[in-house]
Amino acid sequence: MAEITSAKATAKTVRVSPRKTRLVIDLIRGKRVADAIAILKFTPTKAAVEVENVLNSAIANAENNFGLEKANLVVSETFINEGPTMKRFRPRAKGSASPINKRTAHITVVVAEKE
């Protein structure tokens, strides 16, 4: 049986826009874990905080479940899927209303050992 060299973490229905979150994950894809955490710490967006939480969870999964070393890990795969959209309405002039879409995202981060 092959040895497991990667670990995954997912956050579902996170209240951040998928489009804005994709901009953040593009910054860390392929980087070493320590570098990725440093980048996310200094990225001043709500999406960066959420992605950092998922990344830390993936690192913990790698260490605790599979016995991988944190120093050898890289962010091998990250992707954002669109979650359910909450639809709301804002009252406007003359009895009309404008729609508001509160978007959510599913954030997935996979960390793997560097060969």
Curated annotation (Swiss-Prot):
One of its GO terms (biological process) is translation. GO terms for cellular component: cytosolic large ribosomal subunit. It holds the Pfam family Ribosomal_L22. Keywords: Ribonucleoprotein, Ribosomal protein, RNA-binding, rRNA-binding. InterPro entries: Ribosomal_uL22, Ribosomal_uL22_bac/chlpt-type, Ribosomal_uL22_bac/org-type, Ribosomal_uL22_CS, Ribosomal_uL22_sf. It comes from the Bacteria. GO terms for molecular function: rRNA binding; structural constituent of ribosome. Gene3D superfamilies: Ribosomal protein L22/L17 (3.90.470.10). Part of the 50S ribosomal subunit. This protein binds specifically to 23S rRNA; its binding is stimulated by other ribosomal proteins, e.g. L4, L17, and L20. It is important during the early stages of 50S assembly. It makes multiple contacts with different domains of the 23S rRNA in the assembled 50S subunit and ribosome. The globular domain of the protein is located near the polypeptide exit tunnel on the outside of the subunit, while an extended beta-hairpin is found that lines the wall of the exit tunnel in the center of the 70S ribosome. Belongs to the universal ribosomal protein uL22 family. This is Large ribosomal subunit protein uL22. It comes from Lactococcus lactis subsp. cremoris (strain MG1363).
